[in-house]
Design a protein with these regions (language model features):
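Generic N-terminal leader/targeting and pre-domain segments
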Residues: 6-204
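Short strand-loop-strand
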Residues: 339, 343-442, 450-456, 460-470, ...
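Generic hydrophobic, helix-prone segments enriched in Leu/Val/Ile
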Residues: 8, 12, 16-17, 32, ...
Length: 546
């Protein structure tokens, strides 16, 4: 045998004959061979594979020595390949779990899940980079991360189910129940994050499994048992559960994917100061129903309280978040924040922290204006350029025909629309949106604040109204009024704003804090002194001008 040869090194083979048979390891003259089966021979080939691994002792994961050898042979320098291989083995461990005692299944799962964390962190770093990856790379990274989190979560839940059912070896893993439940909750957090990255519908069964992990730990009186989740990460089941509930309840559907990631990392850094209780005492922010699990909901005094409800308060997190904001306001990014090596701008982190602090404030924010049901069609234009084409600036860009949406409900400050996913190309949190209701001659401006997907695959879009009317205006640098440097912006007509400020929409990165502008509006000229950058999107900047 060749020096250094690992007889258990494998290549992934997925036999598709209505099911996945799993992974096949084969040794041939001291080399590793990838065996592929033609489609017409898949069923016969499936029988051959089952025969090969029919006995537990024949399976490469059946003994810890061979399982560890496989793990040691996974390439450490290639994060994509490493995670794919670990993911495949974790899937095999679940699919063929009946071949193993549950304590052996858990013994193998632990080091494989630990080994996956390094490539997972690397891929998260690349996926949530300050500069978005290419579409190809985004899809590749998302698929691998989502696949691993899914397989890991399902395998941990399979161990839980077999333990709960009293499978052989169950008694041997009783002491590891806190770690099992915490890692299961960690994998669920990852699945939720990847769903948020695509504004995808969350599988309702995920909430039931979250309830199962928490309930098992609670029944074993180990919610507060200190544990090492992974190397360098200490937590408890209660902390993992509370962090997930606070993060998801505060950010789901109203932050961009990158902001959701930053928010999850901030909550992870806030520590173990969340409190979980069985009764509502006015301090609980979110409630989770263990009997009929659904996404975390805002806790209210008037809600029906029953024994299966768990309330999560965030007094400690709120104070630590306030302390963090003081540093961020000074331009200081604390070293304790773990963004997996990504370098985010302080202002980027501060914006997310500020929104989280607002969401954790008691009493919770209430709707400022009443919302009423209505069915009205309106034309929409997504993005600064398309809105500019439809403004009255007097320029013709050959605007294409506008998309038409139907409003479901409306208020003085915004509206909600439900559209098929296929008609929502380019729509995301913080997208700038032009709108023109039927029968109205001018266009207004809004920004997407909430996105969620329903069971039918439709996208629910919540839009905050910035202005009922936009006016295209030419803008010149007041210090250098050369007409060759003219840029076009959009003036937001805000009828009820008596602040004396003018609000403009401009191209991204057009705001300069020390540059005054000359604006022509109607037959008048105005000197605009920069006041503040209100918000910046992918293709536009909001600017408040005195």
């Amino acid at each position: 045998m060749a020096t250094g040869f690992n007889p258990y090194r494998r290549q992934a083979v997925h036999w598709r004959a209505g099911w996945d048979i799993g992974l096949l390891a084969y040794r041939n003259q001291g080399r590793n061979v990838l065996i592929l089966c033609p489609e017409k021979e898949q069923i016969a080939g499936a029988g051959m594979v089952l025969g090969l691994f029919g006995k537990k002792t024949d399976h490469p994961l059946a003994e810890m020595k061979s399982a560890q050898a496989l793990l040691d042979d996974i390439p450490k320098g290639d994060s994509l390949r490493a995670l794919q291989e670990i993911s495949d083995w974790v899937e095999t461990l679940r699919e063929q779990a009946d071949d193993f005692r549950v304590d052996h299944q858990w013994e193998v799962l632990c080091p494989y899940d630990q080994a996956a964390q390094a490539p997972v962190r690397k891929l998260l770093h690349d996926y949530f980079a300050p500069q978005a990856p290419s579409q190809f790379q985004e899809n590749r990274l998302w698929t691998l991360l989502d696949e691993y989190y899914t397989r890991s979560e399902l395998c941990h839940f399979d161990v839980l189910t077999r333990y709960r059912d009293g499978a052989k070896g169950a008694a041997s893993i009783k002491e590891d129940i806190p770690l099992l439940c915490a890692r299961g909750i960690h994998a669920i957090t990852g699945r939720l994050k990847m769903a948020a990255a695509r504004y995808a519908m969350v599988d309702p069964a995920l909430w039931r499994r979250l309830a199962a992990f928490y309930t098992l730990a609670e029944s074993h009186d180990c919610l507060e048992t200190p544990l090492t989740l992974y190397a360098g990460t200490n937590t408890t089941v209660a902390q993992s559960f509370a962090t997930l509930v606070l993060w998801y309840g505060s950010s789901a559907g109203n932050l961009s994917p990158l902001q959701e990631h930053i928010a999850e990392r901030l909550f992870a850094a806030l520590g173990s100061r969340a409190a979980i209780s069985r009764s509502y005492d006015g301090a609980g922010l979110f409630a989770f129903d263990l009997a009929q699990p659904t996404p975390p909901m805002r806790a209210t005094a008037g809600a029906t309280v029953h024994p299966a409800l768990r309330f999560v308060a965030a007094d400690g997190q709120r104070q630590r978040l306030a302390d963090l904001l003081k540093n961020l306001d000074k331009g200081i990014l604390p070293e304790g924040l773990n963004f997996y090596g990504a370098k985010y701008e302080v202002e980027q982190v501060r914006e997310v922290a500020q929104r989280l602090w607002q969401s954790l404030t008691l009493p919770p924010p209430t709707r400022r204006t009443p919302r009423r049901k209505i069915k009205v069609n309106l034309k929409v234009a997504n993005g600064f350029s398309k809105m500019l084409e439809r403004s009255d600036v007097g320029l013709s860009f050959g605007a294409e025909e506008s998309e038409v949406w139907e409003i479901e409900d409306i208020s003085a400050t915004g509206f909600r629309s439900v559209i098929p996913m296929g008609r929502a190309n380019g729509i995301r949190i913080a997208s700038l949106l032009g709108s023109q209701p039927d029968g109205v001659s001018h266009w207004g401006a809004g920004v997407v604040r909430r996105l969620s997907r329903d069971l039918d695959g439709n996208l629910h879009i919540g839009i905050e109204l910035l202005s009922p009317r936009i006016v295209g205006v030419p803008l010149l640098d007041y210090a250098n009024p050369d007409e060759s440097g003219v840029q076009i912006g959009m003036y937001l007509n805000r009828p009820n704003d008596n602040s004396g400020e003018a609000w403009l929409l401009m191209k991204q990165d057009a705001f300069v804090a020390n540059r005054s502008l000359k604006m022509e509006l109607g037959d008048k000229e105005y000197l605009l002194l920069p006041l503040a950058l209100v918000e910046q999107g992918e293709d536009t900047t909001w600017r408040a001008i005195a």
